[in-house]
Curated annotation (Swiss-Prot):
Glycosylation sites: 17
Species: Influenza A virus (strain A/USA:Texas/UR06-0195/2007 H1N1)
Coiled-coil stretches: none
Single GO MF annotation: proton transmembrane transporter activity
TM region positions: 20-40
Protein name: Matrix protein 2
Membrane association type: Single-pass type III membrane protein
Activity regulation as described: The M2 protein from most influenza A strains is inhibited by amantadine and rimantadine, resulting in viral uncoating incapacity. Emergence of amantadine-resistant variants is usually rapid.
Family matches, as InterPro entries: Flu_M2
Residues marked Seems to be involved in pH gating (site): 38
Site feature: Essential for channel activity, possibly by being protonated during channel activation, and by forming the channel gate and the selective filter: 34
Entry keywords, A to Z: Disulfide bond, Glycoprotein, Host cell membrane, Host membrane, Host-virus interaction, Hydrogen ion transport, Inhibition of host autophagy by virus, Ion channel, Ion transport, Lipoprotein, Membrane, Palmitate, Phosphoprotein, Signal-anchor, Transmembrane, Transmembrane helix, Transport, Viral ion channel, Virion
UniProt KW RNA-binding keyword: no
Gene name linked to the record: M
């Protein structure tokens, strides 16, 4: 039987003596932030892109406006939408 050299447990560990190097710390922080942003993007991508595309606008505030004026405004907005439904743009390519 021949003698077999087995590694000592200390050699299996991670040698991170230089982990206090600012470049290593910065790379670790950037990696963690990137991972967090990627996970958030995958979870909420539809709502995030919708916010960027349409903005946070939900229409003008109606606080302090009488109900009759609110109803009139709603009707004007609906009429404008209905009028747009009748318009079709025809583009002919030559």
């Amino acid at each position: 039987l021949t003698e077999v050299e087995t590694p000592i447990r200390n050699e299996w560990g991670c040698r991170c003596n230089d982990s206090s190097d600012p470049l290593v710390v910065a790379a670790s922080i950037i990696g963690i932030v990137h991972l967090i942003l990627w996970i958030i993007d995958r979870l909420f991508s539809k709502s995030i892109y919708r916010i960027f595309k349409h903005g946070l606008k939900r229409g003008p505030s109606t606080e302090g406006v009488p109900e009759s004026m609110r109803e009139e405004y709603r009707e004007e907005q609906q009429n404008a939408v209905d009028a747009d439904d009748d318009h079709f743009v025809s583009i002919e390519l030559e």
